[in-house]
Amino acid sequence: MSVVQNNTISTNSITEATSANGVSVDGLKIKDYSLMYGSNIGLTITSEGYVTKPNLPSFVAHSNTPGSGYQSTTGVFPANATNHNLGNHFNTGSSGSSNHAFTAPVDGVYLFTFSSLHSNETATSRPMFYVNGSSDFNGVKHGISNVDSEGSNSNTTSSLIKLSANDYVQVKSQSGSMYYYDQYHSTFTGCLIG
């Protein structure tokens, strides 16, 4: 008996399935139950009524390029290290079109954030999110941030993006160079929210 069919939960099926497993629905007594995302547990309801999402994909990536001072790039933000990478869906490699990118394991809405410390003494920095190599997806440009004053500036860009499984997301400079302070001062984060 299937409780979830075509992404729809049937309350009749829940009643039948839980009754078949000896669990009372009338008293809202539920034994530990898990919903799966592929082979990963996506949601757990404990017998105490707690709901957790232990394996939703998420990451915090940064550049760990050695040195000090400001770095610049005209392409993809070189996030070649992670603080955490739940599900291992962030690619820190430097080859291929999806380098320094998060690849969606499932269809859904994801939240992405890019926070950085910029140096813009002579240039405008416009980091933005690219999906599958394009900044123009769903007819909308996501996450453009202009920083164009002299000296150092902090900057945070975030966006909710609906992705299909195997879509990938990167941070790139829209035009010109993207200036960022080395190592841990600039981070690219993301997680599945629904």
What are these regions (language model features)?
Residues 172-178:
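Short beta-strand-plus-loop segments that form exposed binding edges in beta-rich domains
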Residues 140-156:
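Extracellular carbohydrate recognition and processing domains
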Residues 102, 159-163, 175:
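Exposed beta-sheet edge/beta-hairpin loop segments within beta-rich domains
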Residues 1-15:
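Short, intrinsically disordered N-terminal pre-domain segments
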Residues 152-168:
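Short, surface-exposed tryptophan/glycine-enriched loops
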Residues 130-134:
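Short strand-turn-strand beta-turns centered on an Asx-Gly dipeptide
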Residues 8-9, 19-20, 27-32, 36-40, ...:
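Terminal (often C-terminal
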Residues 122-129:
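Beta-strand acidic-aromatic groove motif in beta-rich domains, primarily in extracellular
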